[in-house]
């Protein structure tokens, strides 16, 4: 009976999956089930080999609907209400679509587990989640011993200036920092996280981390903003860039490499400013 049940379950696992967003592609590769992937987003950078192996069928805001239909996927996976128009077009064509819609670290863990279940890797996804959580505990334990926590401004875009989304704010906290715009982080849409230069000057962050959604961060441009020469982070040359495919990807990248990079920035700041 167990064998029969597993056979039924295996028959339900989608054999042909298209990911129109990067984080699920990386998750499927991490789980060793990339053979199921037949199409991916053109923005995919993790793993690097993915774009050499898989058909590119979308950007983030647009998709080649006809190409997707021609590939005859069992399932298309996307992210958030921002991709709702793509999902609607595909659904009208009879394509099965799964849209993940979360903005938190816990949401990322749920996505990893759900994708694991979809591809028949329940236990492997649990192992991956536990491995990441254990690393988080080590980092949180280390930073909890600090006598002072840095005030941090995360800039998601430069014009207009946009502060960090929820999972970024949570990573800042996890790594031992205080997000100076934590009250905005709960807003899922970037337009609701627009802040002014004066807001940043008043809050006077110790550290600035910028990630401009795929655009190269220009540190000198940040330094030359009117009045920003007064900010501690500018005076002490604590302006850092993290690539958007790492920290702004709501998936494994942000909660692994993103966490490690931010913790390293904070640790170095602490050693320079607090440890005698």
Segments predicted by a language model, with ranges:
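N-terminal ligand-binding lobe of clamshell/alpha-beta domains
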Residues: 3, 8-276
């Amino acid at each position: 009976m167990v064998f029969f049940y597993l056979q039924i379950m295996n028959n339900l696992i989608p054999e042909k999956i298209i990911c129109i967003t990067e984080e699920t592609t990386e998750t499927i590769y991490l789980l060793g089930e990339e053979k199921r992937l037949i199409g991916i987003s053109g923005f995919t950078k993790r793993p690097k080999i993915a774009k050499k192996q898989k058909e590119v069928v979308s950007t983030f805001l647009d998709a080649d609907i006809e190409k997707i239909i021609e590939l005859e996927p069992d399932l298309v996976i996307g992210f958030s209400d921002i991709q709702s128009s793509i999902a609607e077009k595909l659904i009208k064509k009879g394509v099965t679509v799964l849209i993940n819609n979360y903005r938190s670290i816990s949401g990322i863990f749920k996505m990893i587990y759900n994708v694991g279940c979809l591809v028949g890797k329940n236990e492997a996804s649990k192992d991956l989640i536990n491995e990441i959580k254990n690393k988080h505990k080590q980092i949180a334990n280390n930073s909890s011993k600090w006598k002072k926590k840095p005030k941090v401004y995360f800039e998601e875009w430069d014009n207009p200036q946009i502060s960090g989304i929820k999972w970024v704010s949570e990573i800042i906290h996890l790594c031992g920092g205080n997000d100076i715009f934590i009250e905005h982080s709960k807003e899922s849409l970037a337009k609701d996280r627009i802040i002014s230069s004066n807001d940043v000057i008043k809050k006077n962050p110790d550290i600035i981390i910028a990630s401009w959604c795929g655009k190269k961060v220009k540190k000198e441009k940040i330094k030359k903003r009117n009045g920003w020469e007064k900010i501690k982070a500018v005076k002490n040359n604590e302006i850092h860039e993290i690539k958007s495919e790492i920290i702004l990807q709501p998936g494994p990248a942000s909660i692994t490499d993103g966490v490690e990079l931010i913790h390293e920035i904070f640790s170095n700041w602490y050693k320079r400013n607090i440890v005698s």
